[in-house]
C-alpha cells in the first residue's frame, strides 16, 4: 500500500481568511503525524494565498516524517527551497487566477527551465517530483529532466462520472504508472482524491505515495484531524 502525504494548505486557508494566527499549520501537522500520516505536503504559491514562507520554515524544523514542498519552477522559489531544504520538492504549474492546481506541468513545453530547476535542487540533495498528467509524452519529458519522481495528476479520474468513465481514467493512470517505472521514475499521485475514490488508485502497481488535502481537511471540520487521517488510511486499503 502506498504511504499517505497529507496536504495541510487549507488549514492556512482558514487562517488567512481572517488574517489571524490560527489555526496554525504547524500544530495541524503534529496532529496529522500523530494520527499516522507518512508525510506533510504544503504548496507555497507565488501569491502566498494560504501557506506563508514562515509556515514552511517552521514545518521544516518540526515535521518528523517528511516535508514535501510544492512550488512553481521559478528562480525565486528554487532559491527559497535551497535555503529551507525540504525533504522533497514537487514542481507544479501555477496560475494566479486558478482556485487550485488545474492540470499537470507541461514539462515537454518547458524542458529547459524545468530541467534547470531539477538539476539545481537535486544537486543540493533535494529529490524532485514533477506533477504531470498521465500522458506518455509528459512522462518521457520528465525522465529527460533527471527528476526522481513524478506525481500523477488524478483530477480527471476524480471528476469522472459513471463507472465506465472512471474505469477508463483509472486505466490511463495504471498505464502511466507502468510507463513511468519503465522510464526509471518513481511514482506518486494526487489531486481530487477522496474517501470514496482513493482505493483503486492506492492499488496501482508501483504507487508509492498519495498526496491528499481537501478531502481530509473537509472531513476534519466534522470529526477532527486525527480521525479524518485514520479514516483516509483505512479507505486506502478498502474495497
Curated annotation (Swiss-Prot):
Binding site for 3-amino-2-oxopropyl phosphate: 7, 18, 192, 213-214
Enzyme Commission number: 2.6.99.2
Reactions this protein catalyses: 3-amino-2-oxopropyl phosphate + 1-deoxy-D-xylulose 5-phosphate = pyridoxine 5'-phosphate + phosphate + 2 H2O + H(+)
Keywords from the UniProt entry: Cytoplasm, Pyridoxine biosynthesis, Transferase
Position of the signal peptide: none
Location relative to the cell: Cytoplasm
Residues forming the catalytic site: 43, 70, 191
UniProt GO molecular function: pyridoxine 5'-phosphate synthase activity
First-listed, main subcellular location of the protein, grouped into a coarse class: cytoplasm
Pathway per the UniProt entry: Cofactor biosynthesis; pyridoxine 5'-phosphate biosynthesis; pyridoxine 5'-phosphate from D-erythrose 4-phosphate: step 5/5
GO BP terms: pyridoxine biosynthetic process
Binding site for 1-deoxy-D-xylulose 5-phosphate: 9-10, 45, 50, 100
Enzyme's top EC category: transferase
GO cellular component: cytosol
Site positions for Transition state stabilizer: 151
Function: Catalyzes the complicated ring closure reaction between the two acyclic compounds 1-deoxy-D-xylulose-5-phosphate (DXP) and 3-amino-2-oxopropyl phosphate (1-amino-acetone-3-phosphate or AAP) to form pyridoxine 5'-phosphate (PNP) and inorganic phosphate.
Matches recorded under HAMAP family: PdxJ
Family that this chain belongs to: Belongs to the PNP synthase family.
Subunit structure: Homooctamer; tetramer of dimers.
Name of the protein: Pyridoxine 5'-phosphate synthase
Organism: Gloeobacter violaceus (strain ATCC 29082 / PCC 7421)
Gene for this chain: pdxJ
